[in-house]
């Protein structure tokens, strides 16, 4: 939208003010909306969705000479409010800033300027952002709309696989925002399909039969590699705190509060369309923040965690089974919605972003930096597995947030794909040595030792109650 039409829109909205004044007393500054997209890749996957910033030059469309046979999706929920914990710490920080007795100077001056805090209502925490709960209706980054748009894009590219179908399943965890995303995605396909939503419980009692196999892994230790990742510098945080404390005498902002300002910036964009708080940071500080997030994710839930690949391997293995059974299975479209951490586990198993050696914490990896967490799992992340046939051969490849990401040593097929039997060997080598049930002591919480829901949903009908987690 150009700026002239935004101004007209603002004027029109001003006339319609009664509908919105209970939410926001002062209107968002429309001239700022859309100007901060360059920094989304630096905001730890908390800012709105964006496409993968690099490509190998290959289109995500199936190559002309090939015919699509099956598609799978692992998706993250859309743009959301902060979690309870982050929401509470941002609210505490806001109260501290609001309590500051002098006028602000420097980067925080905007707080004096009729600023309204973007988290007035804790009941929104953990929720997807929707037209009903956002602060300003001209915000273009609403989770609801992102999910609908994704549904339409999916249908445009893969709808041919649903041609003869009147019904098909969509699998989702029972987190409310994950389910809502799946539902908005499905609703956007129109009413010619009877979609059967399979709501899979996140509870550890589900064992291996879940989209959140992390939760059922009794031995998982997110901080197992703390001795490695905690070596990363925190100087960028002291720099921010010192700068703001110098500009504003007596503010006494701590390093951890400086760290919270990044989340403030990201979530305020989700809710309002932009955030003045983002202007607090220098480009370098954003780079340090982003690398710290990449590197800690690698050790928390990625290939750097002793059980990252094992936990994601359950879902990767099920995905490989679906590919192998593409001829027999009547359903050709396997859509699954879950959280970023679970998609990170799955990507760890798949290996397309595995650098193959530990990520350094002593410095920012420059030459060898394939693991960008926010590029992999921004809000609304979408990891597609495509299976297509070209003459007499079948091929597999991944499309992550619109970019084809080839498997390094298996990309000689059309569109940088990997021939299916070679892909199966590749997958076996990734999963070799992993044993979810014994490594995770899953038997302490569950007797479900394998993932069955893709195969038994019609008999079982999964219908777990939704919750805010
Ligand atoms: C606000 O300032 C008053 C007076 O300085 C202080 O007693 C109170 O604890 C402060 N509240 C917060 C939330 O910082
Ligand atoms: C749809 O049905 C037609 C005619 O029966 C068949 O040729 C085609 O392969 C089917 N398409 C899919 C995606 O199942
Ligand atoms: C939709 O599917 C469900 C379960 O698969 C079935 O019970 C229901 O009758 C179907 N509804 C329509 C209108 O086809
Ligand atoms: C996780 O690993 C860290 C580092 O080895 C260790 O200090 C911590 O006690 C472990 N936590 C659990 C619950 O085992
Ligand atoms: C600044 O905050 C620290 C704790 O965050 C506190 O110990 C210290 O007394 C505070 N200093 C001032 C001047 O308020
Ligand atoms: C992968 O799935 C197959 C079929 O369900 C199962 O036999 C095998 O044990 C699984 N392997 C892993 C590593 O999960
Ligand atoms: C597949 O086609 C190629 C040429 O297009 C041929 O050389 C090859 O023998 C065929 N393979 C099979 C298994 O039919
Ligand atoms: C699995 O690993 C073992 C031991 O490291 C090795 O001997 C075997 O060839 C591997 N199998 C596959 C399929 O990669
Ligand atoms: C789980 O399995 C382990 C070894 O396979 C066994 O030692 C343990 O007793 C089992 N625990 C339960 C609760 O079944
Ligand atoms: C498996 O565990 C569930 C509860 O976690 C229990 O209801 C069920 O009876 C168990 N099944 C078997 C075969 O032990
Ligand atoms: C977040 O807070 C809501 C409302 O208090 C509660 O229902 C939910 O369980 C909480 N979720 C988490 C993960 O703490």
Residue ranges and their predicted role:
Residues 18-169, 173-334, 338-469:
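Signature for phosphate-centric chemistry
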Residues 1-21:
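Fungal secretory targeting signals
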